[in-house]
Amino acid sequence: MMCGFTSNQSPKKLSSKKLSATNVHLEISPVKCDSPCKGYENVQASYLDTANCTTVTRGADIKDDLPLHNKENLLHRFGDLETHSDEEYSGLQDSGYSSILQNDSPCQDETDNNVSDIQLRETPKNFVQFQKPLHTLSTKNLPALRFEEAMCSTLKKMRKTSKKIDWNAVDDVVCGGNYGLENLIGKNMGLERFDILAELFHRDFKHLLTKILRHLSAMDLINVISVSTTWRKILQKDNSAYNSYKLGCKELCEKKAKVSAHTATRDESLCRVPLASVQKVAASSLCTSKKQSKNRGLSNNRHAEFIEVAQTLKNDQCLKVCVDCSSPAKYDPYLHRATCTRESCKFDFCTLCSCKYHGSKCCQTSKPRSYRVPSEPLPGSKKSKQNLRRL
């Protein structure tokens, strides 16, 4: 028989419920313990029994006297408990069991629970107000979400009143609100042509425009200023680029003056009486040679245009001449429809009546537009001369 405890049992497994304050008895072993270890265990058990007795009685008193949900009384009671514990457990500080007694006491568990309840019930309201949900955050930096919210709210209001959509109200919402949609990235994606200089000018990126214009020569600047009014404004606001443009214009004028120096004397000599007829003949021969060279250049350019457009045709398409500008047009024989490929024209016409394409409707009864040479000969032409000879 072991006396009180076994050698393998640790002192932490003791519970205050199994021991009572009034009936505390140790089991006496009938066999004498000759070894000093067993005798030390008996002394150790006696210390623990007395300590547990004191903690149980103190825990019961605190349960009866402890007020509920009162912070000031709790703090006052905690102070009293600390003084009592220092006085009562002063003799057990050297034994090493005072920490076990403080941790296992039921009084401390109850006080901790009461303090936690008070802290949960008395949470400050300001802290709860500052905790805003995520959906109430500002959307100033999110223009697409702002526009979406505005459109959804207007459509809901319209749905309540009538099932039809009032597009005028939708246009008012789109035009009236400053959502900042112009600053969205990727809104111009998919476009074949895009005016980068105009966009930079509208967004007031002057430093980028100056960097771009510095890389252009004088001839390039002359071409830039003749593109559009916005490009002209861009060039006029940049002083260095505008000055280089002026210098380029002066150089061009000087070159033209040098080229036309020999023709100027000839023009002045036309008013002279002697050798005037000879000079007129020479001038006319030069003009005819220039016209012929220009016509050859135009024909070569048109031939190149038709070849370029022919490379982009589909299997069921062919080429035709535009009715308005005589440029290459893509012709669909199944629909009898042709569209001009020139950017400034892009005339979509019916090949049967040479009018604007009318879809499945019948062609107009009026005569088609004829862009051929009129029946009457022009004055000075071969036909007119022949007619005069006949007369």
Curated annotation (Swiss-Prot):
Subunit relationships: Part of a SCF (SKP1-cullin-F-box) protein ligase complex. Interacts with btrc. Interacts with skp1. Interacts with cdc20. Interacts with pin1; stabilizes fbxo5 by preventing its association with btrc in an isomerization-dependent pathway; this interaction is present during G2 phase and prevents fbxo5 degradation. Interacts with plk1.
Species annotation: Xenopus tropicalis (Western clawed frog)
GO CC, one annotated term: centrosome
Q: Which UniProt keywords apply?
A: Cell cycle, Cell division, Cytoplasm, Cytoskeleton, Metal-binding, Mitosis, Nucleus, Ubl conjugation pathway, Zinc, Zinc-finger
* F-box domain segment(s): 198-245
Residue sites binding Zn(2+) 2 per the record: C350, C353, H358, C363
Lineage of this protein's species?
A: Eukaryota, Metazoa, Chordata, Craniata, Vertebrata
Annotated stretches, region: Disordered: 365-391
Task: Enumerate the PANTHER family for this protein.
Answer: F-BOX ONLY PROTEIN 5, F-BOX ONLY PROTEIN 5 AND 43
ZnF bounds (ZBR-type): 318-366
The name this protein goes by in its record: F-box only protein 5
Q: Where on the tree of life does the source sit, at the highest rank?
A: Eukaryota
Q: Which gene encodes it?
A: fbxo5
